[in-house]
Amino acid sequence: MKRFAAALLALFMLTSCGTAESSLPEPETVAEATYFQQDREQLGELESGYIPVNFEHMTGEWFPYMGYEEYMHGRSEEEFRASVRERYSEAKSDGVNTLYLHVHPCGDAYYRSEIFPRGVSWDGDYDPFAVMLEEAHELELSVHAWLNPLRCQTTEQMDGLPDSFTVKKWTENGIAKQVNGRWYLDPSHTEVDDLLRQCIRELITNYNVDGVHIDDYFYPTAETDFDAAEFAESGSADLGEWRRSNCTRMVKAMYSEVKSCDSRVEFGISPQGSINGNYNSQFADVRLWSGEKGCCDYIVPQLYFGFRNETCPFAETLALWESMTCPDVRLVAGLGAYKLGKADKWAGAAGENEWIESPDIIQRQIELVERSSAAGYAIYK
């Protein structure tokens, strides 16, 4: 680990922005990061078909849909395959063992779906997710299909969809609601749970996924008019508690569907790093989700804060997440390498320039995570 940490520090100091060129350290020992190979081989003797690959020590990297416009749109299958092979090989060489690949970012699909329309960057006649899976598994990387449960298309994109799609129909009956030019599903409706179950079943049935992963897009607004009619009809007294219960019901439905399809496939959640922000702004009850069995297998709080952040200093915030994560849930620390070389205007005066002044900040955060009770880290570049 020390050899790779030193390489990481050197590379950060050579790059002004610290973007995709960063190098991540390998876990300290092979044993910590070895997926359960013996179990996998034993299961393979008993069962036919794919055996999901997951790692005890997770070192993850997100590959968001925004990049698809660059290396998917207008590309042949061969060109796309070469691009993802290069990216995943770089991740592998950086010590990454788990990829979160965006397949359902905005009410759409970057896989062959009978439920959702194609993503806007997918214009080829090949299946991009099949290609991504093949290339990742060839490198012995674990692949978690990354979904955004509630975020849908922009107003313009939705207007262009055929009326046959469920998400389009829901714009007419209030299950989907518009906020700042984009549509979002309202989790107070149990029909949303059913749609997400279908999505998960479609993915696990048709693709050799190792996990399903969601991030921090829960309620898009704290404004009371978003779901005023539904709240009034519910008879609940506390809007915040009611919204949190809606999100928890949805999360548990997704977890249950994953395990129903294949108990060996993992389900993970990556909420924002601020515990209070989760609880009061997005109505994500992360204390509950990380604190008891049945909501997720692992949780990846986005700890995109410097050590000098005045609101959520990294070390103290990591410790808070450690204290509330139970033994049945693995804590993985999300690290914001995309901030390197940039001012952080939300960090307060003490931390605003930390990502500029401290090019070794990610390396130091990794070292702290490795000394903590967390089961790994994940990088957002």
Predicted regions and their residues:
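C-terminal motif of bacterial Sec signal peptides marking the signal peptidase cleavage site
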Residues: 15-16
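Active-site-adjacent "subsite" loops/lids of carbohydrate-active enzymes
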Residues: 44, 51-81, 144-202, 206, ...
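Polysaccharide-binding and catalytic clefts of secreted carbohydrate-active enzymes
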Residues: 49, 80, 87-90, 97, ...
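Hydrophobic faces of well-ordered beta-strands that scaffold small-molecule active sites
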Residues: 59-63, 99-101, 143-145, 212-214, ...
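Acidic-and-aromatic substrate-binding clefts and catalytic sites of carbohydrate-active enzymes
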Residues: 69, 77-79, 104-109, 122-123, ...
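Catalytic domains of carbohydrate-active enzymes, especially glycoside hydrolases
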Residues: 82-108, 206-211, 295-298, 369-376
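Aromatic-lined substrate-binding rim segments of carbohydrate-active enzymes
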Residues: 87-88, 104-148, 235-261
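Substrate-binding cleft of secreted/luminal carbohydrate-active enzymes
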Residues: 293-313, 320-321, 327-381
